[in-house]
Swiss-Prot record:
A motif (TonB box) lies at residues 33-40. It is a multi-pass membrane protein. Residues 45-162 form the TBDR plug domain. It is found in: Cell outer membrane. Keywords: Cell outer membrane, Ion transport, Iron, Iron transport, Membrane, Receptor, Signal, TonB box, Transmembrane, Transmembrane beta strand, Transport, Virulence. It comes from Vibrio cholerae serotype O1 (strain ATCC 39315 / El Tor Inaba N16961). One of its GO terms (molecular function) is siderophore uptake transmembrane transporter activity. SUPFAM superfamilies: Porins. This is Iron-regulated outer membrane virulence protein. One of its GO terms (cellular component) is cell outer membrane. Residues 1-25 form the signal peptide.
Length: 652
């Protein structure tokens, strides 16, 4: 394999030239009125949204091949995909995946507590809807706990699914990936979306997917992965102002790693062995959207999800209720509501100090935000959220954010927002000793939530006809980080575990800091050629604890992405994409071992899309065009080499 690594300096020069080239841009025919809902809880133009927010549109998702949502997020500024192979996760602004809240149509989802030893990165994204069912993806960079509560420290990813239609329609996509290196596993996938009316007031929506990735014959590479999901929604229009929706879905992920193929063959505690993990998720939700005329608009849902790790005999049931009312009052747009969450964990295998196998907890919260139009061109959003939890008591999360439309082209926005992550169930249970090779981990009932304070300032430019650019600076203080320390003998009485490692327990002691800048550019070069790019600079440093002075995790300081799209004819579109990832510190075998610096790398992909008919489109692409090698010895993870993708989309 080859190595193609442009320096950060050359990339910065390229970016500067691209910005200067905007003076020669021609007007495009489309208008840019992108609407978002995640920043404030109601629809608004993206320039006016009180947050740093990016949108991946339906058109973006259809233009090329993405393995999953994680793959699509690689071009978003501020987003770092950590790890590699099929164990990737999503980090926003330097915060780990535990601090990224994932929503589907505004409903939170998480199954991480069925994987207490981080034995399943990449699983969370596998529960998301197939790409054919997604209308757009909204990504908020920075804390949003005022509206969304725990876990929204790094940011929020909201998957917005497609809406019902008044006539039957749908899409089917069939695709295959063939690896040039036959030691890497091929992949086949199919996903579909169909919707239509059952009566004047009742409509149905069904979507699903199946994916099979063959196991690599590369140690630490991709394991054998099978993914299946099916979701149905019934929408009932009570009257023009009120709608009810019932949703139910089932998902399954099976992952297998075998010694002699992708599984580790040496350096294990004891004998290295095959792994066979089976994860399941079932969910059901009922929701109501109402227009109460002069009072405002409401959005209410009740969701139950059951997540199971069958291989380790663990399951967690999450029940969430949330109701929000958005009310215009004079120059104010008021959003307020309540949210409740009940968690019930059953774990029959990992507690090594008592017979306890069940933990549960209930949280309640109230929140309020006000967008105040102080002037025609300036809006100030401020608000707060009060959470109450029987484990840690009460926690308040405030936010203040301003948006100033200087003129029709320029917008300045910025503010201060806060985030928190509540301790997980095992972390606060005193008679729970979580099995771990580095020392069994005792729960601590005195833990407080982890917190962050984010400050940011953005400058945005948009002509409304395709040309747009933005520059954002941010600074984040992360406090009360929960970490493991040696446990006093009067607390951890069980002594060393089966591997001879002394017990540990969790405390709030660590602090960290992240800061950086994010830049974006969309440039219509001609009526048929468009360039889009993003650049992210991130610095992170742990301020206390055993790893003071080190980055938080797998965090490259420099990320750069550029995509060139050419509408060659009415039926033919071609594209090329460059993704540069700067050097980064990688943990070798876990946080307790020495770190090493992984070198930078660049991937270049290219492909075409051709409309065979009005309803059938064929797509082809070459990924990792120059066969850049990313191996475990140098990077701590494995990525695919050159591979070929062929897909067929059928609309009806």
């Amino acid at each position: 394999m080859s190595r193609f690594n442009p320096s950060p300096v050359s990339l910065s020069v390229t970016l500067g030239l691209m910005f200067s080239a905007s003076a020669f841009a021609q007007d495009a025919t489309k208008t840019d009125e992108t609407m978002v809902v995640t920043a404030a809880g109601y629809a608004q133009v993206i320039q006016n949204a009180p947050a740093s927010i990016s949108v991946i549109s339906r058109e973006d998702l259809e233009s090329r091949y993405y393995r999953d949502v994680t793959d699509a997020l690689k071009s978003v500024p501020g987003v770092t995909v950590t790890g590699g192979g099929d164990t990737t996760d999503i980090s926003i602004r330097g915060m780990g995946s535990n601090y990224t809240l994932i929503l589907v149509d505004g409903k939170r989802q998480t199954s991480r507590q069925t994987r207490p030893n981080s034995d399943g990165p990449g699983i969370e994204q596998g529960w998301l809807p197939p790409l054919q069912a997604i209308e757009r993806i909204e990504v908020i960079r920075g804390p949003m706990s005022t509206l969304y509560g725990s876990d929204a420290i790094g940011g929020v990813i909201n998957i917005i699914t497609r809406k019902d239609q008044q006539q039957w329609s749908g899409n089917v996509q069939l695709s295959t990936v063939v690896q040039e290196n036959r030691a890497s596993g091929d992949e086949q996938s199919a996903n579909f979306f169909v919707t239509g009316p059952l009566s004047d007031a009742l409509s149905l929506q069904v979507y699903g997917q199946t994916t099979q990735r063959d196991e690599d014959e590369i140690e630490h590479g991709y394991g054998d992965k099978s993914l299946r999901s099916l979701t149905s929604k019934l929408n009932y229009q009570l009257n023009p102002d009120h709608q009810l929706q019932l949703e139910a879905g089932v998902s399954a992920q099976d992952r297998e790693n075998n010694v002699g193929k992708s599984a580790q063959s040496s350096g294990c505690r004891g004998t290295c062995s095959n792994t066979d993990n089976q994860y399941r998720r079932n969910h059901v939700a009922v929701s109501h959207q109402g227009d109460w005329q002069d009072v405002g608009q409401s959005d209410t849902y009740l969701q139950y999800e059951e997540n199971t790790n069958k291989s380790r005999e663990m399951s967690i049931d999450n029940t969430v209720f949330k109701s929000t009312l958005v009310a215009p009052i004079g120059e104010h747009m008021l959003s307020f509501g309540v949210e409740g969450k009940h968690e019930s964990l059953e774990d029959k295998t990992s507690n090594k100090i008592s017979s306890r196998t069940h933990i549960s907890n209930t949280q309640w919260a109230g929140f309020i935000e006000d967008e105040w139009a102080l002037a025609e061109q300036f809006r100030l959003t401020f608000g707060g959220r009060l959470d109450h939890d029987k484990n840690y008591g009460s926690h308040f999360s405030p936010r203040v954010y301003g948006v100033w439309n200087l003129d029709p082209l320029w917008t300045v926005k910025g503010g201060v927002s806060t985030g928190f992550r509540a301790p997980q169930l095992r972390e606060v249970t005193p008679d729970w000793g979580q099995v771990s090779g580095g020392g069994n981990i005792y729960g601590n009932p005195d833990l407080k939530p982890e917190t962050s304070i984010n400050k940011e300032l953005s400058l945005m430019y948009s002509t409304g006809s395709g040309l747009a650019a933005s520059l954002t600076a941010f600074h984040n203080d992360f406090k009360d980080k929960i970490t493991r320390v040696a446990c006093p003998a009067n607390i951890c009485t069980a002594g060393p575990n089966q591997w001879g490692a002394a017990p540990t327990y969790r405390v709030n002691i660590d602090e960290a800091e992240t800061y950086g800048a994010e830049a974006t550019l969309s440039l219509p070069i001609t009526e048929s050629v468009e360039l889009s790019s993003s650049y992210t600079y991130t610095h992170s440093e742990q301020k206390s604890g055993n790893f003071a002075g080190r980055p938080l995790l797998q965090l490259p300081k420099h990320l750069f992405n550029a995509n060139l799209s050419w509408q060659t004819t009415d039926r033919l579109n071609s594209w090329a994409n460059l993704n540069y990832r700067g050097k980064e510190m990688q943990p070798e075998g876990g946080a307790s071992n020495d770190d090493f610096i992984a070198p930078s790398y660049t991937f270049i992909d290219t492909g075409v899309t051709y409309a065979l008919t009005d309803t059938a489109t064929i797509k082809a692409a070459v990924y990792n065009l120059f066969d850049q090698e990313v191996n475990y010895a140098e990077y701590g993870y494995v990525e695919d080499g050159r591979r070929y993708w062929l897909g067929l989309d059928i609309a009806f």
